[in-house]
Amino acid sequence: MRDPVETYMNLVPMVVEQTNRGERAYDIFSRLLKERIIFLTGPVEDGMSTLVVAQLLFLEAENPKKEISMYINSPGGVVTSGLAIYDTMQFIRPPVSTLCTGQAASMGSLLLAAGHKDMRFSLPNARIMVHQPSGGFQGQATDIMLHAQEILNLKKRLNEIYVHHTGQTYKAIEDALERDKFLTAEMAREFGIVDKVIDKRAEETASASGPKAP
């Protein structure tokens, strides 16, 4: 059976760039990384989180002041993996702009909201979903109680992060996240998860360097 990672890598387009030393080939994502664009795509888990964190740190080392653009299309995933990305976004010096393409659900929506103020965007047909954390555990009764308490602690912390980035009250966030809450791009703007819904890049800012405001 073929390795799915190998199959995927074989499908990634290569681009050729002319340099003073001749031609140089890059896979498309590496070429866009040169333009300080990071893709956060698919389920959030430890492997993906490590790659995103590494790219953020690399781009900070290259230029600690220049904006980093993060394109998000994710159904969410592991809370701790998402928080590793979130903490790194807040830790590094360059401002990180976020743009939702497709969907930003669960931890994806939190990372979308975590972009630099006035630099959080969504395309018009993207969908955003917020909810409280979920989990399961089996074992001794005492261990189950400990894990249940940890989920409650995580719920409280995630609510506080949403409060910080959306400007909503804690009660409003708690009510919104009680069940799966699906938002259109415009609803996400009104809720405070994004700052602007964009459908075109403005002519004066049209470049490969990321989703700057029109």
From Swiss-Prot:
Its EC number is 3.4.21.92. It is found in: Cytoplasm. Belongs to the peptidase S14 family. The keyword Amino-acid biosynthesis does not apply. It comes from the Bacteria. Its main location: cytoplasm. It comes from Rhodopseudomonas palustris (strain BisB5). This is ATP-dependent Clp protease proteolytic subunit. InterPro entries: ClpP, ClpP/crotonase-like_dom_sf, ClpP/TepA, ClpP_His_AS. The active site is at residues 106, 131. Cleaves peptides in various proteins in a process that requires ATP hydrolysis. Has a chymotrypsin-like activity. Plays a major role in the degradation of misfolded proteins. One of its GO terms (biological process) is protein quality control for misfolded or incompletely synthesized proteins. It catalyses: Hydrolysis of proteins to small peptides in the presence of ATP and magnesium. alpha-casein is the usual test substrate. In the absence of ATP, only oligopeptides shorter than five residues are hydrolyzed (such as succinyl-Leu-Tyr-|-NHMec, and Leu-Tyr-Leu-|-Tyr-Trp, in which cleavage of the -Tyr-|-Leu- and -Tyr-|-Trp bonds also occurs). Fourteen ClpP subunits assemble into 2 heptameric rings which stack back to back to give a disk-like structure with a central cavity, resembling the structure of eukaryotic proteasomes.
